Design a protein with these regions (language model features):
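Transmembrane alpha-helical segments in multi-pass inner-membrane proteins
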Residues: 19-109, 115
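Glycine/proline-centered hinge or cleavage motifs at structural transition points of membrane proteins
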Residues: 8, 12-13, 71
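Hydrophobic/aromatic residues within transmembrane alpha-helices
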Residues: 7-8, 78, 120
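Hydrophobic alpha-helical membrane-spanning segments
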Residues: 111-120, 124
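Juxtamembrane/interface helices at transmembrane-helix boundaries
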Residues: 1-7
Length: 344
């Protein structure tokens, strides 16, 4: 969810439910650790649970990086040693007692947010020799004959999407003024205009990312004004974005598999109990197929952030196709693509 909430919602992910599930699971682990602490110590001292200690724990996570277990271990180790060192030597330097380490840690947090927002562990991984880096555990994909659920496609020529006098105002600025259009099944319709004309704003209203000030948006005969983008996605509408929205630290395959989220049925508990592996394999096979379809089959396990801008746009198209859409909205899909990539 980090850094991709709008994209995740547009792919059908219920971000609120996912955040709530993560919060509850984290709370369970925190409760168990607190119980074990009390059982081991046979005495409860409020100091380890104070606000100051909470800030210290947060800084440990920020220092090492919250994306990995090794980052948390590195951050806690560095923080503990630094605090002890600062408490011993800062009073000698300044000649008096005081909470000088708090000032130093505050400055370090500012520097960390500027220079290493993801923590020190990801930085170490980039400069570490390949033979010392932890080996990537690629997701194993096995061939399967199982098929995913598909949307019922409209008949050729049928009106799939209609916008009727759609207007969007941002204060005194009118971004879209009574815009109307119709998209028929089997038709390619282009929305052309200069920069700042409101094309992406129109796309946001058609896909549920934004709500029109006035007018109607009708998809497959149903008015979808004000509906959440994930609900519209479940009806068969998928899209790409003007500014590429990917999860750069995840693999290309994992990014594209997000598009198939709605085509799976397993939930959080099935995932915790590892009962979703068969379905996950089917979803990953679909993601692999779409990547091969758009010419990115050689980059399955590469980090999405390492791709060129043009390849990232193609990745977005593969992700949108993974949802088996009835209608595909492509927002400036050729921007950043070379001639051969456009032709392909």
């Amino acid at each position: 969810l980090k850094g991709g909430q709008v994209m995740a919602e547009s792919m059908g992910v219920n971000t609120f439910r996912s955040k709530m599930a993560v919060f509850i699971i984290a709370s369970v682990f925190a409760s168990i650790s607190g119980w074990l602490y009390a059982h081991n110590q046979t005495f409860i001292n409020p100091t380890p649970f104070s606000l100051q200690m909470g800030i210290d724990y947060l800084f440990m996570a920020l220092l090492g990086g919250v994306g990995s277990v090794w980052g948390a271990i590195l951050g806690s180790g560095i923080f503990t040693m630094m605090r002890q060192w600062l408490q011993d030597y800062l009073p000698i330097i300044f000649g008096s007692q005081g909470q000088y380490e708090t000032i130093v840690f505050g400055l370090l947090i500012v520097a960390l947010m500027q220079k290493a927002p993801t923590g020190l562990w990801p930085m170490l991984m980039k400069i570490m020799p390949k033979n010392l880096k932890p080996k990537d555990r690629h997701i194993q994909i096995t061939d399967t004959t199982e098929k995913l659920a598909v949307h019922a496609m409209p008949s050729k020529g049928e009106v799939v999407l209609a916008a009727k006098e759609v207007t969007k105002k941002f204060g005194g600025l009118v971004a879209n003024n009574k815009m109307s259009l119709q998209v028929h099944a089997g038709e390619i319709l282009a929305l052309i205009g200069p920069n700042g004309a409101g094309k992406s704003t129109m796309f946001n209203q058609l896909s549920g990312v934004d709500t029109p000030t006035s007018g109607e948006v009708i998809f497959k005969g149903e008015k979808i004004n004000g509906q959440l983008s994930r609900l519209i996605a479940s009806k068969g509408l998928s899209r790409t974005f003007q500014h590429v929205k990917i999860l750069p630290e995840m693999s290309v395959l994992e990014n594209v598999a997000i598009g198939a989220h709605l085509r799976g049925s397993k939930g959080v508990f099935a995932s915790l109990l590892h009962l979703d592996r068969a379905e996950e394999n089917v979803l990953l096979n679909e993601a692999k197929y779409q990547l091969e379809r758009v010419g990115l089959g050689d980059y399955l396990y590469s980090e999405a952030g390492s791709l060129a801008l043009g390849q990232q746009r193609i990745l977005e198209i593969a992700r949108a196709l993974c949802s088996d859409p009835c209608l595909l909205l492509l927002d400036e899909p050729a921007a950043g693509l070379r001639l051969k990539e456009k032709q392909a």
